Amino acid sequence: GLENLVMGGGPCACNPEPIADFFDLFFLGEGEEVDLEVLDLLGIAKRKGWSREEFLQKAAQIEGVYVPSLYDITYHEDGTIAAITPKNGAPATIKKRIMPDFDQADFPENFVVPFIDVVHDRAVTEVLRGCIRGCRFCQAGYIYRPYRERSVDVINRQAYDLCHNCGYDEVSLSSLSTSDHSHLADLMEKMLVWAEPEHVDLSLPSLRIDSMTCLLYTSPSPRDTR
């Protein structure tokens, strides 16, 4: 049946093979679209009474979905892979999913907030994805390529809506390297227009000293930009 499907994804699944035997499918790449497509397919499968195998064969046709059971892998004597053979119409190459237009990536702006103190008790908006630095030790800088920025207007609107809808008094501009956003100074100016009178803090994690601008020193939020 279709109960207890085990699905994986995210950075920990960028190399799924060591745990492939324990999963029905993996999402490769970014999940804003592919997870919804798989869930829609699962709804159809349940309504039509598909078997588990039928569902997985259909899911494998969705770009960014890897179904380990649909591939036979043979190895050389030294343990390296000799051949990967797809079965039952599974694609020979699985292409990871990305959001080419980052402004169109789905982002929650109105959700239930916890009624307890939590560690990251603030609104978070993702200002860019990927990184221009290419540090060799950084997994995230490679798996989130290509580098994409959200536009100033979209970030500003998301941050404003999050604070007004959810009651937060702090918003974090999240990314791998926020200070590398090409329009950060313009973004800060626009956000301070509403953040300052409403006493909303602006938090900028992942700053690099070589790309910070004078604006970040001279235009703090009401309780000091961090």
Model-assigned labels for residue ranges:
Residues Y217-R226:
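Single conserved hydrophobic/aromatic residue that forms the stacking wall/gate
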Residues P11-C12, Y142-I155, S179-D186, H199-L216:
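Canonical radical SAM enzyme core domain
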Residues P68, T74, G79-V124:
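N-terminal [4Fe-4S]-dependent radical SAM core
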Residues L5, E170-S172, H199-S203:
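Structural preference for beta-strand elements that scaffold enzyme active sites
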Residues D21-F23, H120-T125, R136-P146, Y168-L176:
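Glycine- and acidic
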Residues V113-F137, C163, L204:
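N-terminal pre-triad scaffold of radical SAM enzymes
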Residues H164-A195, I209-M212:
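Conserved glycine-rich "GG(E/T)P / GGGxP" loop and the immediately following alpha-helix
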Residues G1-K87:
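Glycine-rich beta-alpha loop elements in corrinoid/cobalamin-binding modules
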